[in-house]
Amino acid sequence: MKRIVTLFLSLILLLSCLCAPASAMFDPSLFYEVQAKSAYIVNTDTNIIVYDKDSSRQVPAGGLTKYMTIALLLTNYADQLDNTFQMPFAISDYVHNSDNADMRSNETFTYREAVYAMLLRNANEAAMGLAYSLSGGDLAGWVSQMNTLSQRIGTTGSTWTDACGLDSGNVTTAVDMYLILRYLMSFDAFVDISSAPAFTMPAKEKHTKSFVLLNQNVALNKTSGGSFYRKSMQGGMCDVMAYKNDHGDQSYVSWANQDGSTYIFCIMQSPDTCDTYGYANRRPALYETTRLIDWVFQSFSIQPALDTDLAL
């Protein structure tokens, strides 16, 4: 008789978690006490929610807003990423003295280069310039499309008010960011760009030489990532750049893969004080993400379900 092969995977706990009581089976506190105000971790192979901490809590989106701008771009222009636009002067005042990739007004960029700038450097001018150009200057119309797509993806606690995240009206939740990231991961270009430790921006009209954009997701960089580096890290973005002289909360949305198992990590509003790696640039949400990556891959494993035709 032909053996029946099961088509689903089951999530099983390894020996390291067997000592925990059933009620704490998916609680990382025995390994690490999560300090973020909300968090959501999901295994994308099984859709099992591995960890949920107040995941519907509404929080400031900040730079994570760019994920929605990129989602809208890829939805409409995924096959046109090498098309070009000119960085408009009109957005200069709005993004002045904020996170950027030194993309100057009247310089010409491809859509792809703008995505690199957004994903690697959280560049506000890349998001606003692209949105302004593609909308014909109708930024309100672009934002309306962002909200429509967000709802189509399935978000229920998110509101978008600009293309880059500088406006405080941009709000989201951990579970919504999971849905948005999962949608983005369906685009090969997004996956490829997110995983790049660095990108060389070609020379432009006001840049006589090419220049390098280093990915702020230092967990991708074995050379310079230090204690943050994780081989399993595939890509991610924070709501703000690393802290140095100021203090505050930070959020990080990312995904990791090890031995064929993929997890999405949405860690929202980690306090500055939780980063104990000791570097001058503090990355509290990335710190908590790396600790939770360690917990997940040390505690869980994906195994084939039992063959129902095999005798025990």
Where would I find each of the regions flagged by the language model?
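Positively charged n-region of N-terminal signal peptides that target proteins for export
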Residues: M1-F8
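Residues in well-ordered beta-strands of folded domains
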Residues: L14, Q86, T161, L220, ...
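C-terminal segment of classical bacterial N-terminal signal peptides
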Residues: L14-S23
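Residues in and immediately flanking transmembrane alpha helices
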Residues: L15-S16, D79, D307
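Active-site-adjacent loops and short helices of periplasmic peptidoglycan-processing enzymes
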Residues: S23-V175, L179-D188
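Domain-terminus/edge residues, biased toward the C-terminal soluble/receptor-binding domains
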Residues: T155-T156, S168-L312
